[in-house]
UniProtKB/Swiss-Prot annotation:
InterPro entries: GLI-like, Znf-C2H2_ZIC1-5/GLI1-3-like, Znf_C2H2_sf, Znf_C2H2_type, Znf_ZIC. Residues 31-40, 97-113, 435-444 have a biased composition (Basic residues). GO terms for biological process: central nervous system development; neural crest formation; regulation of transcription by RNA polymerase II. This is Zinc finger protein ZIC 4. It comes from Xenopus laevis. Keywords: Developmental protein, Differentiation, DNA-binding, Metal-binding, Neurogenesis, Nucleus, Repeat, Zinc, Zinc-finger. It is found in: Nucleus. Gene3D superfamilies: Classic Zinc Finger. A zinc finger (C2H2-type) spans 284-317, 326-353, 359-383, 389-413, 419-443. Residues 520-530 have a biased composition (Polar residues). May bind to DNA. Induces neural and neural crest differentiation. Does not induce anterior neural tissue.
């Protein structure tokens, strides 16, 4: 027995003592003479672990998955066959050189067979045994074997990538496998220190084991404990390789739905902007025109809250009971100085300018607010189902939540159709404004192509005003609007956006539209000028 073998055996820590059968197998393999030259043993400083320099030649034939058996027992425990999960973990693999493969097979077949036989007879530390998926590539050089051993030991400790979802072979419940690239980790031409991350990247696609025992598409399968895949830690993304062996991003492989995250959580900017919106205060400007001062100017005072603005307008501008004229002097107010009959009406009107809505709906989950208490009262009936307004016609049991809806319904009984279509040539009339809105969608469609001499789009005038006139004259010159048209502007229902694009005229006013002021032959003149 050699002194070197005895020394290496005696240096093992006490907690890594193996049974006598395994120790005899190791000693027999170490004492077996070899007919070829062994490279000198590397010092301990190469790997940093004394257990990795014991027998470099036989270690070249050991499957790399053996090194990742149980890293919690220390580096030297990686060589213990008690921690091998299945008998296929130790398997002879064909070398790259046929002569080298024959040479190793001739001298070490019985040595490695003893290891595999003893390993198959031991109870696996990870659960039931598992069939090997295929053969494994051998390490071409002992120095590379030592480097691979250290790397595999680190892999066994800190596994930070998910397994392949494309694997279709059946596994036992307590056993799992993981694929690592052999081209990126174990080939001799790829040994630079900077190009070897702990994982060379997940493969593009996992192939099945072939009957001939060929490697799995250049990837080896390592038997790892099943509890490794239940870690809930958040890991960072592994180092990205730039060579041609690198695989696509690992984010694509999430088919096994594991509780492992390889990228940190990135919270969207929503929370930040919500915080900023709360911090930023919108300035509210008072646009009341001070009539008492000459020249007239805006108040232009700014406030941070709606309550402050409303209080300022009520106290400073609306005035108290001594104020007799209740006129709104807000900038660009459509009332144009028309007074209100009471102060409370002016106060309610000012809410249109300030945007104040002091009456919220008390029902939970609704969230609607109103500027007037009457509107809130009507709205609350939608929650309570109250309908206090009954149809006044005999024999009709319809009830409504507000009086305006009852008024609209009454036209059904009177056969009145006060809602008329204002498009020329259309004499449709309806009893309810909703029916008129549906009808106006017909006119909002694209108009037919124009003839070039006169407009094919009829003007919006009442049907009763164009009787007895020539159609050609009415299309070229607009008729003066009647007083009834101005009163019915509130009942005008046209598509606002569609009218601009399709050429639908707007409701008539006191002044003719620019299209009506143009002569009908304007298109003909523009054509002849070029």
């Amino acid at each position: 027995m050699s002194v070197e073998a005895l020394g290496n055996t005696g240096m093992e820590p006490p907690f890594t003592k193996r049974n006598p059968a395994l120790r005899l197998v190791d000693l027999a393999g170490a004492h077996h003479p070899h007919h070829h030259h062994h490279p000198p043993h590397l010092p301990q400083s190469v790997t940093g672990y004394p257990g990795y320099v014991a027998h470099s030649h036989s270690m070249a034939h050991v499957h790399p998955g053996e090194f990742a058996a149980d890293s919690r027992l220390g580096p030297s425990a990686a060589f213990r066959t008690e921690h091998i999960g299945h008998p296929g973990a130790l398997k002879l693999s064909p070398a790259h050189n046929p002569h080298h493969r024959h040479h190793h097979h001739h001298h070490h077949h019985h040595h490695m067979a003893g290891h595999a036989e003893v390993a198959s007879s031991q109870t696996g530390a990870f659960g039931p045994a598992q069939s090997p998926a295929g053969s494994y590539s051998s390490l071409p050089h002992p120095a590379q074997a030592i480097c691979a051993a250290g790397r595999d030991w680190l892999i066994g400790r800190d596994v930070t990538v998910p397994v392949m979802p494309g694997l279709t072979e059946q596994h036992s419940p307590s056993h799992h496998g993981m694929f690592l690239s052999t081209t990126g980790s174990y080939h001799g031409h790829h040994t630079e220190a900077g190009s070897h991350p702990y994982f060379s990247g997940a493969p593009e696609q996992a192939s099945h084991a072939t009957p001939g025992g060929q490697p799995l598409n250049g990837h080896i399968r390592l038997g790892l404990p099943g509890d490794m895949y239940t870690r809930s830690d958040h890991f960072s993304q592994p180092v990205t390789r730039t060579d041609h062996f690198a695989s696509p991003s690992l984010h694509n492989y999430c088919g096994m739905n594991l509780n492992m995250n390889i990228t940190p959580h990135h919270h969207g900017p929503g929370a930040f902007f919500r915080y900023m919106r709360q911090a930023i205060k919108q300035e509210l400007i008072c646009k009341w025109i001070e009539e008492d001062q000459l020249p007239k100017k805006l108040c232009s005072k700014t406030f941070s809250t709606m309550h402050e603005l409303v209080t300022h307008v009520t106290v400073e501008h609306v005035g108290g009971p001594e104020q007799s004229n209740h006129i709104c002097f807000w900038e660009e107010c459509p009332r144009e100085g028309k007074p209100f009959k009471a102060k409370y009406k002016l106060v309610n009107h000012i809410r249109v300018h300030t945007g104040e809505k002091p009456f919220p709906c008390p029902f939970p989950g609704c969230g609607k607010v109103f500027a007037r208490s009457e509107n809130l009262k009507i709205h609350k009936r939608t929650h309570t189902g109250e309908k206090p307004f009954k149809c006044e016609f005999e024999g009709c049991d319809r009830r409504f939540a507000n009086s305006s809806d009852r008024k609209k319904h009454s036209h059904v009984h009177t056969s009145d159709k006060p809602y008329n279509c204002k498009v020329r040539g259309c004499d449709k009339s309806y009893t309810h404004p909703s029916s008129l809105r549906k009808h106006m969608k017909v006119h909002c469609k694209s108009p037919p192509p124009s003839s070039g001499y006169e407009s094919s789009i009829p003007s919006l005038v009442s049907p009763s005003s164009d009787s007895g006139q020539d159609p050609g004259a009415t299309s070229s010159q607009p008729e003066p609007p009647t007083s009834s048209q101005g009163a019915n502007l509130s009942e005008w229902y046209v598509c606002q956006q569609g009218s601009a694009a399709s050429g639908i005229p707007t409701p008539p006013g006191n002044t003719p539209s620019p299209e009506h002021r143009k002569p009908s032959y304007s298109n003909w003149q523009a054509t002849n000028t070029f």
